[in-house]
Amino acid sequence: MKDSERGKEEMKKYISIDIGGTAIKYGIVSENAEVLLKKEMKTEAQKGGPAILEKVIGIVEELKDEADTGVCISTAGMVDIEKGEIFYSAPLIPNYIGTAFKKTVEERFGIPCEVENDVNCAGLAEYKAGAAAGSKAAVMLTIGTGIGGCILLNGEVFHGFSNSACEVGYMHMDDSDFQTLGAASILTKKVAAWKEEPTENWSGYHIFEEAKKGDEICNRAIDEMVDVLGKGIANICYVVNPEVVVLGGGIMAQEAFLKDKIEKAVE
């Protein structure tokens, strides 16, 4: 056996699982953060927390012979990181509160398991190998159906007193909250209402494509969203004083169109 092959055999390998509202993405990751295997399955969120736990058990059963160093789970919802358990979740996944991933995996397979909120995981990834690398203080925001946040201090997630720090989507703003006014989902609602068309006629991608062609209503909706994002990010900066703010989520596929607008709104 070649030394390189022997090194790979001896390398620590982890089962990595990301639980999203639509898909569960999973695979094997090395101790050097190299993705060795990548797969996915449908979440079927409507079936609830117990069904998702069964999917996780199935994934660990499938991969445990190839990667037995540990199981890492990234998930939506608020996570008690000591217990590895969901203690708050939006209605998207019924009966998700109380889902005990860590206890179940460790008792059943004897493999160490850690569970963390998905936005916090995104923030850690940005610190380890992305836009926040080397920063002393950073904020990660994901902008999608809602708005999630993560504070990183010297590369460590700041969880707060009860593991619910930086839930910025619920931040009060203009008689509403940050994510109701500033998340990407607001775009389709506004454009459809202003054009008096069904919401299903519009997607975020469609809105940005029309905005680039000069559509006034699409540009107005984007500008209003950007204004809200600017105010929210500025408020967070007043409190945290970060060295860098990293934006993620599906909407940032439009970075070339949005970056200058958002930076100007924050200023």
What do these predicted ranges mean?
Residues E85-G98:
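A charged helix-plus-loop insertion that forms the helical arch/lid used to bind
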Residues S30, T75, L153-N154:
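A cytosolic small-molecule/anion-sensing beta-strand core signal
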Residues D18, C72-A76, M140-G146, C150:
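Short beta-strand segments
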